[in-house]
Amino acid sequence: SRGLGDVYKRQCHNYDAMDHAKQHPEAARQMKVAAKDNQSCIDCHKGIAHQLPDMSSGFRKQFDELRASANGSGDTLYSIDIKPIYAAKGDKEASGSLLPASEVKVLKRDGDWLQIEITGWTESAGRQRVLTQFPGKRIFVASIRGDVQQQVKTLEKTTVADTDTEWSKLQATAWMKKGDMVNDIKPIWAYADSLYNGTCNQCHGAPEISHFDANGWIGTLNGMIGFTSLDKREERTLLKYLQMNASDTAGKAHGDKKEEK
């Protein structure tokens, strides 16, 4: 409960005593909003806000085990790392990247190569180089360029009411090398949960994931990432996990067809 624990926290962390100029810009922004609404510390920071042991060895061992047990069989696969994608089998220069925890359909297997199909959303009026999980939400699936981008198919379009912008659902075909792909998303989310609890508990109690929406998690995590030792892959995986379980996406399955109109 927030009662007694929050009383103890506010003895040390009184809003009036805070010097926002000495805080990280994102932390200062969040604290100003919390102070205005007189939010409880535990609304964002559950648990004890004291230094906890470094848990990085635990989640890094978990990733090594995930990579070692990776099963790339099946028609639907999920990435565990940032993977380059190519316009043609054997190309030396990449035509984009597949981001962690992203779904692909396998069209063909040829030696060490897979031909894949990637589906995602992009702003119709934009450069259409980034595919996202849902329209209007910056949950990144892949970046595309060159021949991969030139040969995309448009499946449907929708208008996001909040911003009155049109988004297009695109389908891209590309090639990638085998490896670092699994046929079940659940082990990736289990690893990402360990990332979250092992990293975000180092400075404070990890906030409830549903406290922020998918786009809000980008700025929130950026404000904290400088205090961690996460590499780019870990950061991307963690962000995807938080966004897929945010206040406006929680419960949506990977590849859910019921995108918000």
Give the location of each predicted region.
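SH3/SH3-like beta-barrel fold
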Residues: 101, 113-120
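SH3-family beta-barrel domains
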Residues: 54-89, 96-99, 107-110, 129, ...
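Conserved, compact domain cores that house catalytic/ligand-binding motifs in diverse enzymes
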Residues: 182-231
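Short, intrinsically disordered, charge-biased short linear motifs at domain edges
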Residues: 1-2, 25-32, 183-191
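Primarily the internal scaffold of c-type cytochrome electron-transfer domains
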Residues: 18-74, 214-243, 247-248, 254-255
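The canonical Cys-X-X-Cys-His
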Residues: 9-15, 39-47, 196-207, 238, ...
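Short, small-residue-biased leader/transition segments that mark boundaries at the very start
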Residues: 3-8
